[in-house]
Amino acid sequence: MAAGVAAWLPFARAAAIGWMPVASGPMPAPPRQERKRTQDALIVLNVSGTRFQTWQDTLERYPDTLLGSSERDFFYHPETQQYFFDRDPDIFRHILNFYRTGKLHYPRHECISAYDEELAFFGLIPEIIGDCCYEEYKDRRRENAERLQDDADTDNTGESALPTMTARQRVWRAFENPHTSTMALVFYYVTGFFIAVSVIANVVETVPCGSSPGHIKELPCGERYAVAFFCLDTACVMIFTVEYLLRLAAAPSRYRFVRSVMSIIDVVAILPYYIGLVMTDNEDVSGAFVTLRVFRVFRIFKFSRHSQGLRILGYTLKSCASELGFLLFSLTMAIIIFATVMFYAEKGSSASKFTSIPAAFWYTIVTMTTLGYGDMVPKTIAGKIFGSICSLSGVLVIALPVPVIVSNFSRIYHQNQRADKRRAQKKARLARIRAAKSGSANAYMQSKRNGLLSNQLQSSEDEPAFISKSGSSFETQHHHLLHCLEKTTNHEFVDEQVFEESCMEVATVNRPSSHSPSLSSQQGVTSTCCSRRHKKTFRIPNANVSGSHRGSVQELSTIQIRCVERTPLSNSRSSLNAKMEECVKLNCEQPYVTTAIISIPTPPVTTPEGDDRPESPEYSGGNIVRVSAL
């Protein structure tokens, strides 16, 4: 027997650790051909230079996606025998892991927009994200959607009015963003002042102000000084009425505006006044009017337009509507249950105030909210026990949705703070750019007007002085860019003030060729980097600009372009500021307006140029194209 055990024991041990099966048959041959076939199915995915290797069968598990279908062959490169994708390799790691494990995860450190773009490119839907990451993904996506909506609203109610905006759109923009104009800001503060005055008057008119002659009882201030309070209320209601009518007239959608909460508050705030004007002196009718006057207190909600904190609180309550609904439903159930229990528990007591189940509602509400007024208390032992349970259950029911509400309030508050910070940074950045460009353009136009550029071009010894006067590197490059635009195009830069004062006149003159130093042949910092084109020698007649106009240089914002028949003209730019001999009136009733923005100046490059230049065209007239915002 021992010999038999010794014969099969090694096989049992080998089978236990997975070396060989228990069967006594011969071991099968290794799958050499299958392994070779599997190695041939190993594919390489090159994602922006990062190589990933996986099996073809792994990708073909999901044939409805890009990598699992034959569409990936469009990205195959036979030279490298790789599939190349110009995408984000960091996010692609998580996408490839989905093919390997069948679970898609969301990397919390990645941008939600970039992640959605990668999923859409590879044909994956966000709904397959694992449960461990799906809630985080939904929260980040909701925050991003709210941020984009906030940015869109900011762009729509931006500080700069678009030229295509109608008067109605401008009025609505002024109401929604009062800081766009001075008048809108003044009206904003005036309405806020009258809201405060109306609320204070509504409170003060109930304060006793002493007894009047013939009355023993003290009269409230609203009755003793009825005329003064009526005039004050009339002034407030007139302001509120004008504001409501203007908002209604300027609203993009009047139907949506009328149905909005703030519109209903505005109507409720002013409606009691107009009802009181048409009321009779009948005491029964006036009693109903006194009841309506309580709605004047709703004017305090008009402060929500002037308070960011109130708006955030409103957004929080709106976003927590489901949690608040759950809280109300839970409290209602608990109130009904405990009121019924307390009624039957106290039914046997003669001194009990629990006369009915509706009467017990007051006790359960006060107890569950942990107020405890003490006007109704249980007398029996059973009533005290159930009252204690009611108090503890109220604490639990109310405390459950509170963290959710606080979390939503904190999220909305910080999101609003970030949006304000982004708007402030954007405003400061645009202000710095405008200041830099305006200063550079003003310096350029002033130097042209004073003839400094042409004086500097007369001798090469003065170039260091010109460089020292040019200011910062940004200003130097901006001057160089303006000079290149004047050289390569038939444009001349003039300021807005001179353009308006010139009465839209342009002069043409034929002069012989001159070899005098010109603006186009400047070397050094302002030397050209652009090929020479046919040039014009006309100008807006700004040589006669008075000293006062010279001192107040406007922002460079006008380019005059004349596209007419060409005739030989002098190729010299030395007479840039010379007076014209002939003036031609232009038909400017229908000017063409185009917008252009120059943001990247061209670096200076020194290019030697000779005196042999092609002749420049002569311009006898044509339409003027004003290119603004340069």
Swiss-Prot record:
Q: Which residues lie on this side of the membrane: Extracellular?
A: 207-226, 282-287, 346-357, 378-380
Changes after translation: Phosphorylation at Ser-438 in response to MAPK activation is increased in stimulated dendrites. Interaction with KCNIP2 and DPP6 propomtes phosphorylation by PKA at Ser-552. Phosphorylation at Ser-552 has no effect on interaction with KCNIP3, but is required for the regulation of channel activity by KCNIP3. Phosphorylation at Ser-552 leads to KCND2 internalization. Phosphorylated by MAPK in response to signaling via the metabotropic glutamate receptor GRM5. Phosphorylation at Ser-616 is required for the down-regulation of neuronal A-type currents in response to signaling via GRM5.
Q: Any idea which positions bind K(+)? A: T370, L371, G372, Y373
Q: Please describe what happens when the gene is knocked out.
A: Mice are viable, fertile and appear to be in good health. The loss of KCND2 has only minor functional consequences, probably due to an increase of the activity of other potassium channels, even though there is no visible change of their expression levels. Mutant mice show no sign of heart dysfunction, but the fast component of the rapidly inactivating and rapidly recovering potassium current I(to) is lost in their ventricular myocytes. Instead, a slowly inactivating current is expressed that is not observed in wild-type.
Q: Where in the cell is it found?
A: Cell membrane; Cell projection, Dendrite; Synapse; Perikaryon
Q: Cite the entry's keywords alphabetically.
A: Cell junction, Cell membrane, Cell projection, Ion channel, Ion transport, Membrane, Metal-binding, Phosphoprotein, Postsynaptic cell membrane, Potassium, Potassium channel, Potassium transport, Synapse, Transmembrane, Transmembrane helix, Transport, Voltage-gated channel, Zinc
User: What topology does it adopt in the membrane?
Assistant: Multi-pass membrane protein
* Result of altering W362F: Abolishes channel activity. Alters potassium channel kinetics in heart myocytes. Abolishes the fast component of I(to) in heart ventricle
Q: Where is this region: Interaction with KCNIP1?
A: 71-90
Intramembrane features from the record: 358-369, 370-377
List Phosphoserine occurrences by residue. Answer: S438, S548, S552, S572, S575, S616
Q: How does it assemble?
A: Homotetramer or heterotetramer with KCND3 or KCND1. Associates with the regulatory subunits KCNIP2, KCNIP3 and KCNIP4. Interacts with the regulatory subunit KCNIP1; this interaction mediates the capture of both the N- and C-terminus of KCND2, preventing N-type inactivation and stabilizing the S6 conformation, thereby accelerating closed state inactivation and recovery. In vivo, probably exists as heteromeric complex containing variable proportions of KCND1, KCND2, KCND3, KCNIP1, KCNIP2, KCNIP3, KCNIP4, DPP6 and DPP10.
The record's function comment reads: Voltage-gated potassium channel that mediates transmembrane potassium transport in excitable membranes, primarily in the brain, but also in rodent heart. Mediates the major part of the dendritic A-type current I(SA) in brain neurons. This current is activated at membrane potentials that are below the threshold for action potentials.
The record comments on the domains as follows: The transmembrane segment S4 functions as a voltage-sensor and is characterized by a series of positively charged amino acids at every third position. Channel opening and closing is effected by a conformation change that affects the position and orientation of the voltage-sensor paddle formed by S3 and S4 within the membrane. A transmembrane electric field that is positive inside would push the positively charged S4 segment outwards, thereby opening the pore, while a field that is negative inside would pull the S4 segment inwards and close the pore. The N-terminal cytoplasmic region can mediate N-type inactivation by physically blocking the channel. This probably does not happen in vivo, where the N-terminal region mediates interaction with regulatory subunits, such as KCNIP1 and KCNIP2. The zinc binding sites in the N-terminal domain are important for tetramerization and assembly of a functional channel complex. The channel undergoes closed-state inactivation, where conformation changes lead to inactivation through an intermediate state involving breakdown of its 4-fold symmetry.
Question: Under which name does UniProt file this protein?
Answer: A-type voltage-gated potassium channel KCND2
Organism listed in the record: Mus musculus
**Name of the encoding gene:** Kcnd2
